[in-house]
């Protein structure tokens, strides 16, 4: 009986010790959690004094940066006009000449066409001739007006066109007046043509012949039409 009572007392003592240990551990956990929450609140919610101090420092920094940038830009803007004044003083005469040239080109926009004239077709046999008097302006530096050679060029062009027409008419009349030998050759070629019309031509020769017909007379290159003449003695 005594042994049983002793064991019960020991069991009660051990149970009390375990309960105290568990309660102490729970209290320590609760304390640590409370400390963590307090630290977290302090980090996430800073005080108003800290916020004001940081915002004031940033505002002061921004004001200083803006003042420095404005001062540097004003210094650059002060330096640039001085350089521009120097350049305009040095190149004043050159700019005047450029203005005169620009005014001239505005009045005569077809200067390059008159200077580099294309080849003019004189007759259907592709004979060409260029103008001998190009249109070249002369810029006067003494402030006088620009002098050009427009009037002599126009008169020379009219004379050239008249001479071209006369020459083309003369050559055309010369070509129409054939000699007896040429007439005989033409008759002979007509006979050859009639003879070869009996045969079937290849497709390549047909296309070449059609292309030659479609071409205009002033695009033709002058060639001797009597270079190769076949001799057919018997038909």
From Swiss-Prot:
Cell compartment(s), UniProt: Secreted
Keywords noted in UniProt: Milk protein, Phosphoprotein, Secreted, Signal
Tissue expression remark: Mammary gland specific. Secreted in milk.
Keyword Repeat in annotation: no
GO MF term list: protein homodimerization activity; zymogen binding
Residues making up the signal peptide according to the UniProt record: 1-15
Record PTM Phosphoserine, positions in chain: 23-25, 28, 47, 72-74, 77, 147, 149, 168
Biased composition (Polar residues): 144-158
Stretches the record annotates as Disordered: 144-163
GO cellular component, one term: extracellular space
Family: Belongs to the alpha-casein family.
Cited PANTHER family: ALPHA-S2-CASEIN-LIKE B
Function: Important role in the capacity of milk to transport calcium phosphate.
Protein name: Alpha-S2-casein
Organism per entry: Sus scrofa (Pig)
